[in-house]
From Swiss-Prot:
Region (Formaldehyde-activating enzyme): 1-161
Active site: 17 (proton donor)
Upper taxonomic lineage: Archaea, Methanobacteriati, Methanobacteriota, Stenosarchaea group, Methanomicrobia
Organism for this UniProt entry: Methanosarcina mazei (strain ATCC BAA-159 / DSM 3647 / Goe1 / Go1 / JCM 11833 / OCM 88) (Methanosarcina frisia)
Name under which the protein is recorded: Bifunctional enzyme Fae/Hps
Listed GO MF terms: 3-dehydro-L-gulonate-6-phosphate decarboxylase activity; carbon-nitrogen lyase activity; hexulose-6-phosphate synthase activity; hydro-lyase activity; orotidine-5'-phosphate decarboxylase activity
Length: 392
């Protein structure tokens, strides 16, 4: 057996975070147990868990402090409430049948325990570490989380200490608001008026990028830290370099023109994926986007069917969205140019995943009100809006 579990519990400086391994004495966990007990490290000295002095639990459990212990006050928090809490959690796990009683002499546990240097309340240290250890053991032996849970939750989750959410596009449809006005003061003011929504994307439009460069992404992020920000560079050359520039500026997606050489598009997509951002292919003025897609080594994450500002008054169809999705089934399809409120149902019915709207929102007398109308037209609830959340 070689099982791994993790759990976080509590709040404030007494917060407990436990990572543990449980496995056979003769296996890798047993080897780690023996190494930890015999190879001491200053500030991270391992110790056996005990319910009280002279009463260790079964399976035998080794505690390793995560945070460097610098003085005896800090040591007392480990050699005391945390040591006892971990041991009692192990014993109770056996009593409750989580750990099979007939295997306690065959197994060992190695638990890495976090104790904040400023933790003071021994009662909370005990209770939080007891709960976290017990939960980590249960999760380890149940194989929690399974891969389906990981994939479902990974796009919803925000790390509590990180303090901001990294948005991914997994729950379409979305409203992408394009800011082409090169007046930065106006753009930032308008962005601050946009309602917070899991289904809103912010686009730094081409004129804005041309005037301020990719540094404008950081300016936008100061106003909307959690936003998914698209940098509309309409790249035509040096695809890998421009993708890296957007990634370095903390953007979420870069736009490449479908008119660019195939090698440029390929390099941009490759670099975007390497750096963890999305690659968007804009089909503006490209008469045969299907042909372009068929020549690519890897599909872009988003394919934008686009007519330009200068031709929005002409008769237009967004093209065969269904055919594009057959060629690139995992890609999202965005529609841009002439998207107004009365066109939203049509675009969605044709299979559009992203509606790109510019002046219909950004030039409105009431930006917030108009944005709300578009958001409501998506008819999409917020992610986990009705979920009562603890850890899961």
């Amino acid at each position: 057996m070689f099982q791994i579990g993790e759990a976080l519990m509590g709040q404030g400086s007494e917060l407990a975070h436990v990572d543990l391994m449980i496995g056979d004495k003769g296996g890798p966990v047993g080897q780690a147990f023996a190494n930890g007990l015999t190879q001491l490290s200053a500030g991270h000295t391992p110790l056996l868990s005990v319910i009280r002095p002279n009463l260790p639990p079964k399976p035998s459990t080794l505690i390793i402090p995560k945070v460097t212990v610098k003085n005896m006050d800090q040591a007392a928090r480990i050699f005391g409430p945390a040591q006892s809490a971990v041991a009692k959690a192990v014993a109770d796990s056996v009593e409750e049948g989580v750990i099979p009683k007939d295997q306690v002499e065959d197994l060992v546990i190695v638990a890495s325990v976090f104790i904040h240097p400023e933790a003071q309340d021994y009662n909370k240290i005990y209770r939080y570490n007891y709960g976290a250890t017990k939960l980590a053991i249960k999760r380890a032996l149940e194989g929690f989380p399974d891969i389906d849970t990981v994939l479902e939750e990974s796009n919803k989750s925000t790390h509590a200490i990180m303090g901001f959410k990294v948005t991914r596009l997994w729950d379409p449809p979305y409203l992408q608001i394009a800011f082409d006005n090169p007046n930065l003061e106006f753009v930032l003011s308008a962005i601050s008026e946009i309602p917070k929504s899991d289904h809103v994307i912010i686009e730094a439009g081409t004129p804005l990028i041309k005037r301020y460069g990719t540094d404008v992404i950081s300016k936008i992020r100061q106003v909307r830290p959690d936003a998914f920000i698209v940098a509309d560079l309409k790249t035509l050359d040096t695809g890998n370099l421009e993708a890296r520039m957007v990634a370095d500026a903390a953007g979420d997606a870069i736009v490449v023109s479908a008119l660019a050489p195939i090698s440029t598009i390929d390099k941009l997509i490759e670099e975007a994926h390497k750096t963890g951002i999305y690659a968007v292919m804009d089909t503006l003025n490209q008469q045969d986007p299907i042909s372009v897609l068929k020549q690519l080594k890897v599909m872009p994450d988003v394919i934008e069917l686009h007519r330009g500002i200068d031709i929005e008054g002409t008769e237009h169809a967004w093209g065969n969205i269904g055919e594009i999705k057959k060629i690139a089934p995992k890609a999202l399809v965005a529609v841009a140019g002439g998207v107004r409120l009365d066109k939203v149902p049509v675009a969605l019915s044709q299979g559009a995943d992203i509606l790109v709207v510019g002046r219909a929102i950004t030039n409105a007398k009431d930006v917030r009100e108009m944005a709300e109308q578009f958001i409501n037209s998506l008819n999409k609830p917020e992610i986990d809006q009705f979920r009562v959340m603890t850890d899961f």
